[in-house]
Amino acid sequence: MKILFFGLSISSAWGNGHATTYRALIRALHERGHRIIFFERNAEWYASNRDLPEPPFCTLEVFESWDAIKARVRKELQDADVAVVGSYFP
């Protein structure tokens, strides 16, 4: 399956318990053969503390603003099987 995640951050676990949960879940989905794209808004407090800037188990799309990424999101949603929107997603 193709699964899109919209979440707070997967690239930085700094002050962010969401990242550890996302990492475990998405790693397990990847190991089962699913294709994952994670959309994360670029936030300075996470950008300066990224401990996983290129996750090996998903495609990470860091974006500056919703307007800058919404055309890409619409395109990816067309053939996605699942879209997951996490809490605190801007």
PLM feature segments, named:
Residues L8, E40-N42, E64, V85-F89:
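Structural motif
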Residues T21-Y22, I69, F89-P90:
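Amphipathic coiled-coil/heptad-repeat helices and related helical stalk/stem segments
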Residues R27-E31, E61-E64, Y88:
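Glycine-rich loops and low-complexity Gly/Arg-rich segments
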